[in-house]
């Protein structure tokens, strides 16, 4: 109830455990992927050295793309080097005849666009899609009680996991649009220079800790003990990371107009406005979450990003030891 005290201890423990866990799991997955690449390269080199190398993947793709059904739809000029894309095209080509060829070709173009994305871009777009899906679920009247229980962080509830799930909820279409626009802009830049697993760990951790900061504010000032939602804490964390990367490397992307001089100014102006909102105790906007996310992003990218490399290397070393033991 609104008159109940807002407890903090469990939320702090949960946020610390989540941040540690998401970084360890993400680093482990990244190490698995890197080690898989190394194993494939090793096998390829060994096969070529023995003179037994065959491009089985290429042959599989040629068989799929050379089938009469696929050729009738895409023509002989269509080429792909991706097995997953070839399988998707084959599936589309074999859909029922009542689906027009134009519709099938449109679906194939969409598949081509998806496979043309980098792993980082797919990760960012997947995160945006998840936010849109959750926003849609909020619009289903019969789901409102469930969404309010599990996708809105309410300080009086005593729940901690909603500090994570509330990141994917948004109050209005405008709220969703601007947060997703910012997530797209910063996410694409970040995933250009760090693995997508690292991006996920940074984004989710910044969002959870930013929500924790709002939770602590509500414990100190009961007037702020209202429901929290939104991705802005995580987005501000990415903005902080991008600011440091800009300061180090200059322009990260030719298509992105900000420079190493203007990016820090943009973040400082945003954070200064958040400080004003906090000082005047304005409500309705998560100023504390914004400020916390920005500070976390800058601090992490400037001083603690080496922790990620150490985690990944430690997991890769375990892989190597396991291989030697076997």
Spell out what each predicted region is.
Residues 2-326:
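A detector for small-residue-rich transmembrane helices and their helix-helix packing motifs
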């Amino acid at each position: 109830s609104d008159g109940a005290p807002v407890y903090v201890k469990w939320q702090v423990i949960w946020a610390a455990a989540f941040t540690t866990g998401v970084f360890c799991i993400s680093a482990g997955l990244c190490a698995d992927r890197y080690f898989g690449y190394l194993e494939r390269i090793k096998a390829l080199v060994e096969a070529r050295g023995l003179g037994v190398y065959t491009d089985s993947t290429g042959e599989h793709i040629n068989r799929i793309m050379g089938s009469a059904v696929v050729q009738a739809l895409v023509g002989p000029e269509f080429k792909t080097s991706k097995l997953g894309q070839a399988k998707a095209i084959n599936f589309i080509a074999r859909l029922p005849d009542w689906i027009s060829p134009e519709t099938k070709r449109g679906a194939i173009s969409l598949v081509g666009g998806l496979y043309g994305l980098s792993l980082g871009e797919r990760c960012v777009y997947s995160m945006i899609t998840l936010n849109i899906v959750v926003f849609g679920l909020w619009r289903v009247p019969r789901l409102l009680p469930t969404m309010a229980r599990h996708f809105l962080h309410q300080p009086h509830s005593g729940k901690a996991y909603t500090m994570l799930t509330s990141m994917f909820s948004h109050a209005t279409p405008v709220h969703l649009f601007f947060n997703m626009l910012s997530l797209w802009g910063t996410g694409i830049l970040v995933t250009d220079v760090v693995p997508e697993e690292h991006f996920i760990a940074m984004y989710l951790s910044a969002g959870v800790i930013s929500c924790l900061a709002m939770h602590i504010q509500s414990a100190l000032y009961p007037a702020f003990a209202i429901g929290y939602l939104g991705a802005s804490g995580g987005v501000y964390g990415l903005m902080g990371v991008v600011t440091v990367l800009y300061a180090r490397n200059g322009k990260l992307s030719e298509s992105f107009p900000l420079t190493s001089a203007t990016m820090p100014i943009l973040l400082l102006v945003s954070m200064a406005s958040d400080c004003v909102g906090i000082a005047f105790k304005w409500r309705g906007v998560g100023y504390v979450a914004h400020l916390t996310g920005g500070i976390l992003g800058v601090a992490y990218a400037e001083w603690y990003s080496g922790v990620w490399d150490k985690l990944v290397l430690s997991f890769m070393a375990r892989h190597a030891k396991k291989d030697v033991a076997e």
